[in-house]
Amino acid sequence: MREIVHIQAGQCGNQIGAKFWEVISDEHGIDPTGAYNGDSDLQLERINVYYNEASGGKYVPRACLVDLEPGTMDSVRAGPFGQLFRPDNFVFGQSGAGNNWAKGHYTEGAELVDNVLDVVRKEAESCDCLQGFQMTHSLGGGTGSGMGTLLISKIREEYPDRIMMTFSVVPSPKVSDTVVEPYNATLSVHQLVENTDETFCIDNEALYDICFRTLKLTTPTYGDLNHLVSMTMSGVTTCLRFPGQLNADLRKLAVNMVPFPRLHFFMPGFAPLTSRGSQQYRSLTVPELTQQMFDAKNMMAACDPRHGRYLTVAAMFRGRMSMKEVDEQMLNVQNKNSSYFVEWIPNNVKTAVCDIPPRGVKMAATFVGNSTAIQELFKRISEQFTAMFRRKAFLHWYTGEGMDEMEFTEAESNMNDLVSEYQQYQEATADDEGEFDEHDQDVE
């Protein structure tokens, strides 16, 4: 039954991942010991997508936890759902990657990668029909970015026909841990462009703005940010975990969302945005959900969709609501804002509805957009990258681990190409084709 193997790498990946398992265990009625005590058959119908049923009716996440230092994993193990995971699936080193992509990708991470692949292989073998992998990691550090992308390429090698999906936290200057984030992120994007099928770009800057502006939290903590991420991840994976009318699996999502193989970086959004304490006071209507969901303030990537155009969109609605009303509202959005959707992909908005709402609200909606505006995010990283790289600042940390400057140049130009590709399709119109054909003939 269409299983997904989950991998979380590095500090950020493990913290988001742990939160994700808390949220979905709660939604499926699974307590911290792995026992089921839910109240609806729907919770168990597709439980095996993310959980393995072990002896004694215990449910165990199909998860592999990876880090180059033991700290974060110890806190996951000590956390509320720490006893849920298989103890053998914790794989960690002692050295740490020190926020250095090269350590994660070429030296320290490369030593640990085979142990991780053993765990992944074991999880994959216990699946009936594996549909793919999902990874949570950040692009700014050393382990999640360097070792995370190494794992992705190794898994890609071994399971070339399975879908690879990532939830990637993109660094931002407003919440910065390290000065070399632009290097690590650029080197990672260079890998993600080639090796993943779908990447959800989660942007700390956007999460901060949401907490600060919308939720009125004056000093947002990582806990608050991760709460938003886990709501989004839960929403994105709803179709995979519950039976529904438009039963998305990872492959169907990819087929609907990715018009060109390199342009698979999605902007997630979520509605209603409520802070942890004030969820129960007001119930939203379908029109309000739809309107909020397309609002730039609700996007988890700090890009303004009004600066670009949507190639494709997927929306997941959750809760008891009328399909008819949902369809009407979605059409309404498209008709009113038709200039923000490319006209050369007709029907480029897909909607799914699932009956089970997330905890604490009657209805919710999750938004996944493939928008050309995501180029703003890559431009931002690219500018910071170039500023340091032209002075060769901090490069010795990377060349010291055996990297070549050439690799930086390649990553830089690959990311710039990606930006131009998005720009090209943003400007393309339905009647451009004639021109392209003529060019082809000249070439011959």
Swiss-Prot record:
PROSITE patterns to which the protein is assigned, alphabetical: TUBULIN, TUBULIN_B_AUTOREG
What the protein does?
Answer: Tubulin is the major constituent of microtubules, a cylinder consisting of laterally associated linear protofilaments composed of alpha- and beta-tubulin heterodimers. Microtubules grow by the addition of GTP-tubulin dimers to the microtubule end, where a stabilizing cap forms. Below the cap, tubulin dimers are in GDP-bound state, owing to GTPase activity of alpha-tubulin.
> What protein is this chain from?
Tubulin beta-4 chain
> What are the subcellular locations of this protein?
Cytoplasm, Cytoskeleton
Concerning Pfam families, the annotation shows:
Tubulin, Tubulin_C
Q: Name one GO biological process term.
A: mitotic cell cycle
**Chain intervals with Acidic residues compositional bias:** 429-444
One function term, GO molecular function aspect: structural constituent of cytoskeleton
